[in-house]
Design a protein with these regions (language model features):
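Short, surface-exposed beta-strand/loop "edge" segments at domain boundaries and coil↔beta transitions
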Residues: 87-94, 106-108, 115-123, 176-179, ...
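Hydrophobic residues embedded in beta-strands of well-ordered beta-sheets
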Residues: 105-108, 168-170, 260-261
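Bacterial Sec-dependent N-terminal signal peptides
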Residues: 1-23
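Signature of long, low-cysteine stretches enriched in small and polar/charged residues
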Residues: 21-104, 203-259
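Generic structural signal for short, solvent-exposed loop/turn connectors between secondary structure elements
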Residues: 3, 19, 63-73, 164-168, ...
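Surface-exposed amphipathic alpha-helical segments
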Residues: 25-30, 110-161, 258-290
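Hydrophobic, Leu/Ile/Phe/Ala-enriched alpha-helical segments that form helix-helix packing faces
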Residues: 130, 195-204, 253, 286
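Flexible, glycine-rich surface segments
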Residues: 147-222, 226, 247
Length: 290
């Protein structure tokens, strides 16, 4: 149970990187059954055919299921098919729901969720790529992949490691890692800062150590933020069943192979530690302490 606690993190780097990375170079994707999942610029996105007709009757069912007021749904003329869009502000995050007409004349729902302000141009560009079936198949990672595409470098998966989502890898007792590719380094820094603040505010996580450390992240000299969390409440009880008491997290943002990347690496106090690197095996594959 302890390895189900995930973080998206923050580091504080003072370099700038003004070049924008193109959308498809930032996009990650997987397929699972009849759903597609995407990640880009801090968004988590699902695309699913609702199997409902693109008509009044179909929308009535869709809106009722999703607790949507029909008056809140508005067409977007920049989307390349018939559509309705609903924006919802939730506590701590925002959502955009695009109901689009697909080739079967049924409703496909492209659902965006993001911690921070929505980026309409990113949403519209991705929806149009989906509508026109222009997402390259090579971007879809297999669910049972035996390697990690880490910012353009393939890393063999350790035994017993598995994906729990897009760019989320967990290795019981050997560390866990989450990452995302962003348009600019500044975007990555902003995203990780927002997420770190959100995680720190959770009552179940109490930071007992916070410090900046020098590391080599994918062979690039980098400052990482190292935080040790004391875990409380129900999560503490679940983690304690397997011996976990504290969680050490490294928050990093850096440009790697011309890709601005935000990454979190974490491990429990009773995880396996490499005597040479001082880190669990998974973390040791992408980072070294200086």
């Amino acid at each position: 149970m302890k390895h189900y606690i995930l973080f998206f993190f923050g580091s504080f780097l003072w370099a700038t990187y003004a070049q924008e990375l193109p959308l498809l170079d930032r996009l990650s994707a997987i397929k699972n059954g009849n759903r597609e999942f995407y990640a880009i610029d801090g968004y988590t996105i699902t695309n699913e055919d609702l199997k409902l007709p693109f008509d009044e009757k179909g929308f009535k069912k869709a809106y009722r299921k999703l607790k949507i007021n029909a008056q809140d749904a508005q067409p977007n003329p920049r989307i390349l098919t018939d559509n309705y869009v609903v924006n919802r502000d939730k506590e701590g995050y925002v959502e955009s729901l695009y109901f689009v007409k697909n080739l079967a004349n049924t409703i496909s729902l492209v659902w965006f969720s993001k911690l921070r302000d929505r980026e309409v141009e990113v949403e519209e560009a991705l929806v149009n790529l989906i509508v026109e079936n222009k997402i390259p198949q090579e971007l879809f990672a297999p669910v049972d992949a035996n390697s990690i595409n880490f910012a353009g470098r393939k890393i063999p998966m350790l035994n017993d490691c598995y994906f729990t989502g897009i760019n989320i890898v967990q290795c019981p007792y050997n560390g866990e890692m989450n990452w995302g590719i962003y348009r600019t380094l500044e975007d990555a820094q902003q995203a990780v800062t927002d997420q770190f603040v959100a995680n720190k505010q959770r009552k179940m996580f109490k930071p007992i150590v916070e410090e900046e450390v020098e590391v080599l992240f994918e062979e690039v000299p980098t400052k990482a933020k190292r935080v040790v969390f004391d875990i409380k409440g129900v999560v503490s009880a679940l983690a304690g069943m397997s011996g976990g008491k504290t969680l050490t997290v490294y928050y990093v943002a850096q440009v790697v192979r011309n890709r601005p990347i935000a990454c979190v690496m974490s491990f429990w106090n009773n995880d396996n530690i490499n005597a040479t690197t001082g880190l669990p095996p998974l973390l040791s594959r992408v980072m070294r302490l200086k």
